[in-house]
């Protein structure tokens, strides 16, 4: 996997690609984690990750001659290419008893080269940033990019080894990245229940003692639930109905996929998915053991739930940001980005547009059409230029998908990068939320908070919140718009970030229903917002830190070995169960029981949402 260069990307001339495609000076700046400017250091890796986010189609295996109906018309058209076998191969990574390939990769480097203290410090920063980032498609791609960046930064010159090309060869997949950094979170040390103080530091005794057996068993049960849910939704992408092997029934799919949007009915669990059914049915017992608001795990003296603490921290961060906004925007950003590199600041928004246009958006525009065309062209060009190399150097379990009949499925979109990995749509909403991806940029995080306040305060009467979204969005589209409310809290007012229209473009592309779902209805979107820790994810407020300060911070993170989430795993168990039930509708009695129990858990966390019943039945 990470052996010498004969296992890495081979150039056109047959020589070793020892540079890995990195720009000169790519590894010179101190690593800070989730830095949008890093994407510009290796365009080849960006193309590779976009390619690896798409499914592969192959011709279905023909039936044995003795099974063919003798009366069948020999002139029938051959079956269309299918992604079913590829989906099955990818979904295998989400089994609980499969090795984490990211952990295995790190272990291979450790055994072959040793892990330097500098690498450990950088990796600790990456882990900290992913725990503070919103789980979304762009975050998954960024985590993959920066994982490769760190391995090459420390081992490309020293070991003449590069991870560039590993995702194209399917040695690693974006599903492995999601599992390691966002689903199971192999490096997490809090057992799924945030125990950190408001300052973000770990209790010394807890950090020293680590997790007990009971904590790890309970967290493994949670991990099985979320991985099984993700796997079940991924398997719905297979475009053939289930047979006697018990695979999931395919769901008519896609905003722009191979079928019409699905407006009713649910998927069907087959016999092989009965363990997933059992896990979903027992979600409440699973959540109870990893719920910060429950009697089993509430810490003595705790007065705030994880959600209340996260909201309080966000409010305080926004107050600090706005108190230094003029100085910060006038100097620090410009110093950090320097002249002609200002556009790199919006790299995550541009990546959102590229990945999600026409696969997770409803309102078409010239920019979304061009972005969708660019994504398809990127995938097709990468496949055309690397196909020969990949045919002789691809992971064995994916070797079938580089044969002569294999072709990337560009119509379905970057399914493997998305959080929920299905392509179903309902009520003008899609599996991947555009607004969740916007949160990765500080200015857009702030703009979304202001936008929500403007929607809530738009009318002093009892106007429907849904009806308030369009006029607020329309007012924001006017460059000379005035604040919509006199005083709607800190940072109130209808202002937009100066991002050359990126924020408005993506908000319009998402559509009113998707905005409404994200802001007020969907438990997954609500948790994504709360999980995002701006004081950790974004660069510090004020002047950029000195390189020595950055290195000291990373060393502290590595030595403390305290990696805690912001939202307790019990709420994530609820959210994943909710999203799975949107695709696989439970029976009425089970559905009513779930809505009741989910509502109680959300109320205990003081997390108000509009009508879980409506969201469950009308959105995805």
Swiss-Prot record:
Quote the record's binding site residues for Zn(2+) 3.
306-307, 568, 605
Where this protein primarily resides, as one coarse class?
A: host cell
**Which Pfam families would you find in this protein's record?**
Herpes_env
Molecular function (GO) terms listed? zinc ion binding
Q: Which domain of life is it from?
A: Viruses
Q: Does the keyword Zinc apply?
A: yes
Name the segments for region: Zinc finger 1.
100-186
The record lists the organism as Equine herpesvirus 1 (strain Ab4p) (EHV-1)
Region called Zinc finger 3, residue ranges? 306-605
Q: What does this protein do?
A: Plays a role in efficient localization of neo-synthesized capsids to nuclear replication compartments, thereby controlling cleavage and packaging of virus genomic DNA.
Binding locations of Zn(2+) 1 = 100, 103, 180, 186
Cellular component aspect of the GO annotation: host cell cytoplasm; host cell nucleus; viral envelope
* Keywords linked to the UniProt accession: Host cytoplasm, Host nucleus, Metal-binding, Zinc, Zinc-finger
Its annotated compartments are: Host cytoplasm; Host nucleus
Family designation: Belongs to the herpesviridae UL32 protein family.
Segments of this protein annotated with the region Zinc finger 2: 433-525
> Mind telling me which PROSITE patterns this protein's record contains?
HERPESVIRUS_UL32
In Swiss-Prot or TrEMBL terms, this protein is called Packaging protein UL32 homolog
Task: Summarize where Zn(2+) 2 binds, as residue positions.
Answer: 433, 436, 518, 525
């Amino acid at each position: 996997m990470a052996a010498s260069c004969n296992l890495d990307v081979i150039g056109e001339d047959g020589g070793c690609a020892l540079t890995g495609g990195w720009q000169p000076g790519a590894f010179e700046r101190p690593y800070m984690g989730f830095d949008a400017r890093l994407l510009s250091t290796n365009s080849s890796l960006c193309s590779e990750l976009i390619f690896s986010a798409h499914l592969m189609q192959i011709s279905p295996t023909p039936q044995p001659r003795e099974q063919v109906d003798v009366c069948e018309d020999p002139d029938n058209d051959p079956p269309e290419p299918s992604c079913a076998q590829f989906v099955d191969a990818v979904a295998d990574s989400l089994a609980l008893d499969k090795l984490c390939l990211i952990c295995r990769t790190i272990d291979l480097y450790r055994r072959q080269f040793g892990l330097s203290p500098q690498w450990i410090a950088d990796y600790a920063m990456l882990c900290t940033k992913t725990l503070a980032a919103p789980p979304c498609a762009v975050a998954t791609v960024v985590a993959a990019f920066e994982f490769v960046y760190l391995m090459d930064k420390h081992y490309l010159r020293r070991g003449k080894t590069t991870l560039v090309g590993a995702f194209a060869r399917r040695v690693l997949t974006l599903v492995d990245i999601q599992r390691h950094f966002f689903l199971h979170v192999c490096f997490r040390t809090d057992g799924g229940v945030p125990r950190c103080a408001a300052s973000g530091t770990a209790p010394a005794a807890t950090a020293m003692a680590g997790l007990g057996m009971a904590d790890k068993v309970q967290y493994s049960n949670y991990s099985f639930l979320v991985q099984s849910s993700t796997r079940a939704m991924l398997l719905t992408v297979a475009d053939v109905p289930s047979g006697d092997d018990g695979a999931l029934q395919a769901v008519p799919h896609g905003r722009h996929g191979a079928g019409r949007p699905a407006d009713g009915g649910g998927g069907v669990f087959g016999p092989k998915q009965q363990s997933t059914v059992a896990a979903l049915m027992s979600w409440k017992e699973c959540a109870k053991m990893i719920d910060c608001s429950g009697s089993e795990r509430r810490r003595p003296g705790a007065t705030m739930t994880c959600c209340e603490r996260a909201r309080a921290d966000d409010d305080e961060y926004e107050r600090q940001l706005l108190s230094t906004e003029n100085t910060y925007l006038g100097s620090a950003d410009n110093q950090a980005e320097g002249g002609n590199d200002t556009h790199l600041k919006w790299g995550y928004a541009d990546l959102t547009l590229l990945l999600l246009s026409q696969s997770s958006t409803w309102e078409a525009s010239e920019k979304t059409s061009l972005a969708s065309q660019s994504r398809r062209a990127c995938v097709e060009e990468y496949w055309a230029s690397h196909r020969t190399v990949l045919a002789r150097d691809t992971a064995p379990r994916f070797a079938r998908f580089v044969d002569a009949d294999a072709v990337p499925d560009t119509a379905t979109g970057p399914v493997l990068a998305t959080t929920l990995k299905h392509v179903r749509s309902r009520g003008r909403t899609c599996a991947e939320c555009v607004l969740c991806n916007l949160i990765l940029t500080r200015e857009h995080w702030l703009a979304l908070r202001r936008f929500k306040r403007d929607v809530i305060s738009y009318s002093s009467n009892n106007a429907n919140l849904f009806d308030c979204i369009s006029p607020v969005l329309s007012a924001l589209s006017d460059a000379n718009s005035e604040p919509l409310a006199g005083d709607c809290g800190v940072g109130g007012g209808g202002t937009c970030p100066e991002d050359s229209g990126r924020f408005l473009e993506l908000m319009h592309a998402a559509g009113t229903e998707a905005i409404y779902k994200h802001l007020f209805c969907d438990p997954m979107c609500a948790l994504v917002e709360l999980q995002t820790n701006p004081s950790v994810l974004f660069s510090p407020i004020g002047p950029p830190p000195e390189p020595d300060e950055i290195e000291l911070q990373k060393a502290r993170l590595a030595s403390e070995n305290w990696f805690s989430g912001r939202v307790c795993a019990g709420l994530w168990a609820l959210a994943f169960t909710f999203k799975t039930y949107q695709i696989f509708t439970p029976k009425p009695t089970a559905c009513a029981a779930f809505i009741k129990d989910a509502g109680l858990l959300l109320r205990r966390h003081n997390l108000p949402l509009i009508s879980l019943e409506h969201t469950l039945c009308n959105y995805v």
